[in-house]
UniProtKB/Swiss-Prot annotation:
Gene Ontology terms, MF aspect: glutaminase activity
Catalytic activity of the protein: L-glutamine + H2O = L-glutamate + NH4(+)
Amino acids binding substrate: S66, N117, E161, N168, Y192, Y244, V262
Protein's recorded name: Glutaminase
Keywords: Hydrolase
Pfam families linked: Glutaminase
UniProt keyword annotation of Lyase present: no
EC number: 3.5.1.2
Organism in which the protein naturally occurs: Proteus mirabilis (strain HI4320)
Amino acid sequence: MTTTLSNALLSDILQQIRPLIGQGKVADYIPALAQVPANQLAMAVYTVDGELYQAGMADKRFSIQSISKVLSLTLALTRYDESEIWQRVGKEPSGLPFNSLIQLEMEKGLPRNPFINAGAIVITDMLQSRLSAPKQRMLEVIRALTNTADICYNTVVAKSEMEHLSRNAAIAYLMKSFDNFDNDVITVLETYFHYCSIEMSCVELVRCFSYLANQGICVGSKNQIITPRQARQINALMLTCGMYDGAGEFAFRIGIPGKSGVGGGIIAVVPDAFTVAVWSPELDKSGNSLAGCAALELLANKVGRSIF
C-alpha cells in the first residue's frame, strides 16, 4: 500500500533514520566541512504541481559540493552544442573513487562522466571559455531557479578547498597534457571550488532542480531551462553516475536518479512527479550521506515510486 506525501510522512522518516547518526563520518579532508555538527537532519519534497513538503532543518543551508556538478552540466548544455560536450567528457560510470587519476591516465585524459571531479572540472573549463563571469552567472541561474536572491558562495569553504587543491590540480594538469583543457588551471579550479561551496537548503534544492522532474521546465517560473530530452539525459547520468562509486547500490535500493555531495546533501528526482532533497552530514564509505540514503529508501518504498 502506498502512502501520500505529507509533512508528517517526512517527519516520520527522519524519526526512523535518526538512530543512524553516529554511524557515518563527516567529510574531514575539507577543514571547513569537518566542523559541521553531525546530528542535523533535513528533508524536502517539491512536486511538479508546486506542492512543497518539508521536515527537520529543511531551511538550513549547507555546502552542496558535488550536487553543483549537475548545475554546471545544465549550464554547459545551454551554451554548447551537445556534441562538443560529449567529445570532452564521457557518459559511463567510473567504478573508481571520484578523484581517481588512474582511469584518467589510462583513458588519455577523457573523464568517464561529468559527475566525477575530472568531468566536472572539464565542464567548468568549458564554462570558463564561454562565459565572461562564470561564478556570477551560476549564482544568477540558481537564484532564478529558486526565486531566492541571497543564495551565495561560502568563501571560507572555497578558500579551504583552494588551500588543498593538489589532487584536483593534478587531475586538471593531466587532462591538459592530453589537450583536454583550455584555460589556466588555477583560474578554472577557483571557479570549480566556488561552485562546490554554494550553500542551499533542502527547500531551495528541490525548487532549484524541479526542471529535472518537469520535462526541463522550472516548476516555479515555468521557464524552459533545457529540453525534455536533455532532462532525461541528465537524469540517466544521475542514475548511473550520480552517487560516486555507490551508484549501483543506490539504484538497486532506491531506484531513482540522485546526485550527492560530500556536504551530506542528496538531490533525487522522480520524473513527472517530484524532486526530493535530504541532508545529513555523516557519509558512508562511498562519500554519500548515510542517513540521507536511508531516508530516500524509506520514501521510495512508502510512496511506491521508482523509475523501474
